[in-house]
Amino acid sequence: MLPDLSIEHDLQRRGYANLAGIDEAGRGCWAGPVVAAAVVLSPAVYRQPDLLAGVNDSKQLTAGARERIYTSIQTHALGVGVGIVPAFLIDAYGILPATRLAMIQALLALPCAVDALIIDAVQLPGISLPQTALVRGDERSLSIAAASIIAKVTRDRLMATADHCFPHYGFALHKGYGTAVHRRALAQYGPSPLHRRTFQPVIEALLSLEQS
């Protein structure tokens, strides 16, 4: 089933007009930032949801489809905000606090007022706005699904750029996720400055290099 506006309509009936869907990309990666996006859909999308036809959980879409829909979201959203937390802060704070920080950054980057939040799976402490945390929210809420695509495309572009700076790791291919290619590169070259040194595969690569 594709995400829809059922949850958004329910919140609007309760008096919350501008709703921000929030999601992240890159939480489980071995390298690179965690990126979050916040998306407020426009009244036009609520009247005509097929303006964002094809929006789904970003993991279910091809890279080409994500790029196309990314453009549609930017065109039809009332506001889009992005937050980026780099690997060294992930190591300093831990991945969950870093994810929340990226989400708060994305919320603060929105160019429009927000009445309530619909978030994929987590709550944001210290934020006074009403929050609805949905497990697998990117499969249920169109706002969250749109945010997941913005976050994923933004992060993929960053990792493609990082591939030019650190060409030995294959970042353009795997985007920092754990793959056999990535593991072999870690074993051969050791971690780059973009690697999360508190993540177990990176720790193992460091220990192996120290012992060799």
Curated annotation (Swiss-Prot):
It is found in: Cytoplasm. Gene3D superfamilies: Ribonuclease H-like superfamily/Ribonuclease H. Residues 17-211 form the RNase H type-2 domain. Manganese or magnesium. Binds 1 divalent metal ion per monomer in the absence of substrate. May bind a second metal ion after substrate binding. Keywords: Cytoplasm, Endonuclease, Hydrolase, Manganese, Metal-binding, Nuclease. Its EC number is 3.1.26.4. A divalent metal cation binds at residues 23-24, 120. CDD domains: RNase_HII_bacteria_HII_like (cd07182). Pfam families: RNase_HII. InterPro entries: RNase_HII, RNase_HII/HIII, RNase_HII/HIII_dom, RNaseH-like_sf, RNaseH_sf. One of its GO terms (molecular function) is RNA binding. Its cofactor is Mn(2+); Mg(2+). It catalyses: Endonucleolytic cleavage to 5'-phosphomonoester. The keyword Nuclease applies. GO terms for biological process: DNA replication, removal of RNA primer; mismatch repair. Belongs to the RNase HII family. Endonuclease that specifically degrades the RNA of RNA-DNA hybrids. HAMAP family: RNase_HII_B. This is Ribonuclease HII. It comes from Chloroflexus aurantiacus (strain ATCC 29366 / DSM 635 / J-10-fl). The gene is rnhB.
